[in-house]
Regions:
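Conserved, mostly hydrophobic/aromatic
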Residues: 27, 49, 80, 120, ...
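Hydrophobic faces of well-ordered beta-strands that scaffold small-molecule active sites
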Residues: 3-7, 31-33, 58-61, 88-92, ...
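An alpha-helical appendage that flanks or caps ligand/catalytic pockets
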Residues: 107-143, 184-303, 341-352
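N-terminal beta1-alpha1-beta2 module of alpha/beta enzyme domains
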Residues: 1-61, 151, 346-352
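Alpha-helix-loop-beta-strand connector modules within alpha/beta enzyme cores
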Residues: 43-63, 67, 123, 328-346
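Acidic (Asp/Glu)-rich catalytic clusters
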Residues: 24, 46-57, 77-88, 167, ...
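Active-site mouth loops of central-metabolism enzymes
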Residues: 2-14, 63-70, 147-158, 213-216, ...
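Short, acidic/polar
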Residues: 11-23, 76, 157-165, 294-303
Length: 352
């Protein structure tokens, strides 16, 4: 299994670059950057990271086809791929928080993602393109350079139709936050529909899962509040899908939690999110995160590998008193040796 990490853009730019260098030295496969509204710009930071690293993979997870025109994304990502040949990938998904961009209304992600990827790939071939899609429109344009490298294109989701789209046209699929076999098998069932539609096989794609990770000192240690908060936001962002799945994911769903899922307001207010965290069953929490002692984390990652997950992209949640860098070092020393493919040392070069 390949083990990668991700930044949400919260740390300073200097600290981000230091984290990328640290992750490379520790043997992580990739350091991805979230494309969140409105944190620090991922394109600027990933471009800088190409100069402060030499081996580690880089890229975006997750971007969307609406916030930036896909032609501009094609231009920027091909430029980045030239800076770090073979190391850059894009993970595209449905996006979120469009309420801050009133001109984006009624997005249909399956259609938008398909159209965006089609246009980007055509532009990367050097073609002059006119594209008249439902969401993506482009008139008689082409890149004014011949890309010397192009990024790999993955699709991320936990919704059935987008997972199927990933199987159909993606070079990889990033499963959104499922960390146990039932969730992975659910996702694989929908990915298989896309593979079948396109007459592809599992050998044609890479299967990844996004997981929230915290290492505890003791099995009975209380789960830190920060990872509860992060995981609950992931759950709530796919409320409809998760409501339909809760009984497949866990056997400890309470009537009170089920009632909350059906009756709570469709909002992100502090009160609603606090109730969600309070009511969330431990089994549901474990289905979307990896929390435990080093031995427990190793066992959980091995169980994911056993059902076909080839890469985990971790969002690291340090415990109180611990920094992200501390957790990366702890993961590298206590987890990676037991589960991860090790990088080839000849891939390194000295970077100032």
């Amino acid at each position: 299994m390949r083990v990668s990490v991700c930044s949400l853009g919260e740390e300073t730019n200097v600290r981000f670059l230091e984290q990328v260098k640290l992750a490379e030295q520790l043997g992580f496969h990739a350091f991805m950057h979230a494309d969140e509204k409105w944190t620090r710009d991922p394109y600027v930071r990933v471009a800088a990271a190409t100069r402060s690293s030499s081996r580690i993979g880089l890229g975006f997870c997750v971007t969307d086809p609406y916030t930036r025109h896909p032609a501009l994304s094609a231009q920027a990502c091909a430029t980045l791929a030239e800076l770090a040949p073979g190391r850059v990938r894009i993970v595209m998904g449905a996006g979120s928080h469009f309420e801050t961009l009133p001109t984006i209304s009624n997005p249909k992600p399956v259609k938008g993602i398909r159209e965006g990827i089609e246009l980007m790939r055509r532009l990367w071939t050097g073609e002059r393109v006119t594209y008249d899609g439902e969401f993506v429109k482009f008139k008689a344009g082409k890149l004014d350079f011949d890309p010397q490298a192009v990024p790999r294109m993955y699709i991320a989701s936990r919704s059935p139709l987008i997972l199927a789209l990933g199987g159909e046209i993606g070079e990889g699929v990033l499963i959104g936050s499922f960390a146990t076999a039932p969730g992975i098998e659910y996702a694989k069932g929908h990915i298989q529909k896309g593979l079948t539609r396109a007459k592809r096989t599992w050998a044609d794609i890479q299967l990844c899962s996004w997981v929230y990770v915290t290492i505890l000192d003791r099995e009975d240690e209380e789960i830190p509040e920060n990872i509860k908060r992060g995981m609950s936001h992931a759950f709530w962002s796919s409320r409809k899908t998760m409501t339909e799945m809760v009984d497949k994911l866990s056997g400890d769903v309470t009537p009170e939690f089920r009632k909350f899922l059906h009756e709570a307001p469709h909002e992100w207010s502090p009160e609603v999110m606090a109730d969600l965290r309070r009511l969330l069953p431990r089994g549901i929490f474990d289905s979307m995160s990896v929390v435990g002692t080093p031995a427990q984390v190793v066992a959980r990652l091995k169980s994911l590998a056993a059902v076909g997950v080839q890469e985990t992209i971790m969002w690291p949640f340090p415990k109180p008193g611990q920094e992200v860098e501390d957790l990366l070092i702890q993961l590298a020393h206590t987890v990676l040796p037991h589960v991860a493919e090790r990088p080839k040392r000849e891939g390194y070069r000295l970077v100032d």
